[in-house]
Amino acid sequence: MDVSPPQQLPLEAQQRVCEPTCVLLEVADQPQEQRLGLMQRPALPPLRGMWFPFKPARPLRFWMLNTIAPLDMVFVHQGEVIAIEAEVPICLALPCQSFGPMADADGVIELGTGEAKRLGLGVGDAVVIEPITLKSPKQKVDEIRRSVTGDTLW
């Protein structure tokens, strides 16, 4: 059993589901980050997830070893959902089942269990992953004011 502490990666990207809904994503783009994934992490809140990009595309299989909360896995190839593994159960000891399509994928989004369905994600849907632009505190305050007041003259 892996006793690595859980990793918490910075929110670096977002997935546009349908305007204006975005899922904030931690990006696991290094082999060690991908190996640890969401191990030992509590359940993800709504609109949060982890993005695992892979180059080149290839058949990807994920398992849930030491993942303590069930997840949805959204497999992506060239900006399109190619498979969804919903409500994947936890696995605390080997052997663990692996999940994924037999087709090439260039990324996987892990979401809290039931989140893919709640968001209405389906096979064939477009997936847009974009970096989060860092904003100054003033820009954040102005954005909140605009969202509350509807005023575009800030």
Give the role of each language-model region:
Residues M1-W154:
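Compact, glycine-rich, soluble single-domain proteins
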